[in-house]
């Protein structure tokens, strides 16, 4: 199952976010996991993807300080959330604060996961990195052709 596309949504007054129907149709049950992501985003995974992903993190050596730090940061900032009957999730307050989300969000399909961004933060991220995208793509795709 792959998630793709970019969707423009708003949190409602109770801080619930409606998952786009095209994404919701790919989620087999009503439980998803929302975690602190990178670059200021949140990440949402299905139960199956979360189990795979967290297993990889938890299998890293706990004797390494950096591993403990990143494991602590990610796993402690992950919440199991339920999708209600009309396709909404309630994002916990601590995650909203970590991602500077107030109302307007972008929901980005990222293959095996979904990123949730505050719109202003994502627009700034895009503006700050747009000049480098071609260079980065060249480097990445050259590695794929070897």
Swiss-Prot record:
HAMAP family: MraZ (MF_01008)
GO MF term list: DNA-binding transcription factor activity; transcription cis-regulatory region binding
Chief location bin: cytoplasm
Gene3D superfamilies cross-referenced by the UniProt entry: Transcriptional regulator MraZ domain
GO biological process assignments: negative regulation of DNA-templated transcription initiation
Swiss-Prot/TrEMBL keywords: Cytoplasm, DNA-binding, Repeat, Transcription, Transcription regulation
Pfam families named among the record's database cross-references: MraZ
Protein name as catalogued: Transcriptional regulator MraZ
Lineage: Bacteria, Bacillati, Mycoplasmatota, Mollicutes, Entomoplasmatales
NCBIfam families in the cross-refs: division/cell wall cluster transcriptional repressor MraZ
GO cellular component: cytoplasm; nucleoid
Alphabetical list of SUPFAM superfamilies matching this protein: AbrB/MazE/MraZ-like (SSF89447)
Organism: Mesoplasma florum (strain ATCC 33453 / NBRC 100688 / NCTC 11704 / L1) (Acholeplasma florum)
Annotated ranges, domain SpoVT-AbrB: 6-49, 78-121
Compartments where located: Cytoplasm, Nucleoid
Gene it is expressed from: mraZ
Source species, domain of life: Bacteria
Description of how the protein assembles with itself and partners: Forms oligomers.
Similarity comment: family membership: Belongs to the MraZ family.
